[in-house]
Amino acid sequence: MSSGYDEPLDPEECLRLLASRSVARLAFASTAGDVLVLPVSYRVDDSCVLVFATSGSGVLARLAHGERVSVQVDDVSEELHNGWSVLAHGHATAYKGDVSPQAWIAGHDEVVIGIELDRLTGRAVSAFG
């Protein structure tokens, strides 16, 4: 049996993988100072902005006023013991672009938020080479 690998992914590959998915975990600081991690459905526009929609009264709506956030997306095969993970960091603001994200819940599309990504890191791992 050959040994596995744990390799960093370059930013271009991270962006490609991020764009290949539609659900991520969004992390940000709550008004109480706790770190919240919530799932969001998203799309990536042509200028590398991650875009999602939310209700006007939800906890995510305040991100439209400018917040530092992190987004994590992955694909893991427990059966094959391999996968990848991408972590993106950026600044969230109200989005004015052309991408229309698909909200999963009716009425949760009142506020559209874009995250201008300024740092992308990722890793690919496998138990077997």
Language model: regions and residue ranges:
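Extreme N-terminal tail/first-helix region
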Residues: 1-19
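Charged, gly/pro-rich active-site loop segments
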Residues: 2-5, 70, 74-129
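Charged, amphipathic alpha-helical segments
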Residues: 7-12, 53-58, 96
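Sterically constrained small-residue positions within well-ordered secondary structures
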Residues: 17, 33, 62, 79-81, ...
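Short beta-strand segments
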Residues: 21-55
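A generic structural signal for short beta-strands and their flanking turns/coil linkers
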Residues: 22-24, 36-38, 48, 65-69, ...
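A short mixed-secondary-structure module that forms the rim of ligand-binding clefts
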Residues: 41-78
